[in-house]
Amino acid sequence: MLRLRLRSIVIGAAIAGSILLLFNHGSIEGMEDLTEISMLEDYTPEAANKDYVGQQEEEELLYDQPSYIEEEEDPDLEAYLSDLEREELEHSLEELDEENNYKLHLRYSFSQLQDFDEENEAVHMIVPKDTYEFEVPYHADIPKLIWQTSKDPFDREVMKYTRFWRINHPSYSHAVLDDEQSKALVISSFGDSSVSKISQAYAMMPLPVLKADFFRYLVLLAKGGIYSDIDTAPLKHINNWIPREYRKRNIRLIVGIEADPDRPDWNDYYARRVQFCQWTIAAAPGHPILWELVRRITDETWKLHDSKKLSKNGESVMEWTGPGIWTDAIMDYLNWQYGPFSVENITNLEEPYLVGDVLILPITAFSPGVGHMGSKSPNDPMAYVQHFFAGSWKDD
């Protein structure tokens, strides 16, 4: 009898526990349902889209950090700027006049082209060797380095141009290298000519202009930064080269159109139908376009060497190291990586055009004032660099 009573108690407890468990489970599910209903009552398509866009922006920021700090968008800008950068941003290179028309404004303008002390300028131009001996991998930003070359960096005719890059960009490292310094940088970056085909190709080139062309690609490949010919001067600060809408994108190569001769006889005057200029280039170190370009130039140099055709023939410069092969390397990469891509994509270009991590600037950017092919005045807001064409490479 006692055994039956105990059995009944156990069975009753089990049934009660099961009922309690089912009740609790149902209550939890009910709470979830109520939560979902309350969320649906607050739901609007605008709110959902805002949340999604906000999430997208947060994810993009994790991978697309801005290459350049933008003063207007960062309330804590002062916390990140060095004294030199702060000084730079306090002196705008552009402004509007009283009639709201654009006018050129430099901290140091071209009216002061001959007004400088040579000894003082020479002191500022001396660049310690260790400022350009460091390695930066591809996928880095374009570093704050400005590269220029000259047989005599301290010649007054050279300094009257190069100083504008240094004075207007005090937070950048600025190097004007002579032939021996350029050679040393190539060897330190790519190895001695006894073991490096690249360095040996550089050493074998018979014309100074060939070496000058090749060096700009090599230094940008190895170190990155901005290369500009010694007879150029900035019309805008380098930060202004990238439009506001692209400043949070990872831009790793900036090129400008040199020529856009939309006419049947274009090949009588230019190497390519649309041609990119080489007198000013900005790049992150290790960019694939630069690697491919260096490979092509190295292969061509060795091919000419092996066939005993290395000569001082300036007619081959356009195709050997000049704008022809430079343009081909860019166009081939963009077509292969983001294609189809052809000259039709950039003919009569009037605004900066971003393709992947390559920013293509219209002809006015680096070729203002040429008077044709859509090039506008050096006073135009899109004019970034003035090229004075003072070089005489054909006489070398």
Swiss-Prot record:
Just give the chief location class: endoplasmic reticulum
Quote a single Gene Ontology cellular component term.
endoplasmic reticulum membrane
Q: Where in the cell is it found?
A: Endoplasmic reticulum membrane; Golgi apparatus membrane
Ranges in the Lumenal compartment? 29-396
Q: Which GO terms describe its biological process?
A: cell wall mannoprotein biosynthetic process; glycoprotein biosynthetic process; protein N-linked glycosylation; protein N-linked glycosylation via asparagine
Give the record's membrane topology.
Single-pass type II membrane protein
- Extent of motif DXD motif: 229-231
What InterPro entries does the annotation carry?
GlycoTrfase_DXD_sugar-bd_CS, Nucleotide-diphossugar_trans, Och1-like
Known cofactor(s) = Mn(2+)
Supply the alphabetized keyword list. Endoplasmic reticulum, Glycoprotein, Glycosyltransferase, Golgi apparatus, Membrane, Signal-anchor, Transferase, Transmembrane, Transmembrane helix
* Catalytically driven reaction(s): Transfers an alpha-D-mannosyl residue from GDP-mannose into lipid-linked oligosaccharide, forming an alpha-(1->6)-D-mannosyl-D-mannose linkage
Instruction: Name the domain of life.
Output: Eukaryota
Family from the record: Belongs to the glycosyltransferase 32 family.
Function in brief: Mannosyltransferase involved in outer chain elongation of asparagine-linked oligosaccharides of the type Man(9)GlcNAc(2). May otherwise add the first alpha-1,6-mannose to the Man(8)GlcNAc(2) core oligosaccharide from the ER. Represents the first enzymatic event required for synthesis of outer chain mannose linkages on yeast secretory proteins.
How is this protein named in the record?
Initiation-specific alpha-1,6-mannosyltransferase
Q: Which organism is it from?
A: Schizosaccharomyces pombe (strain 972 / ATCC 24843)
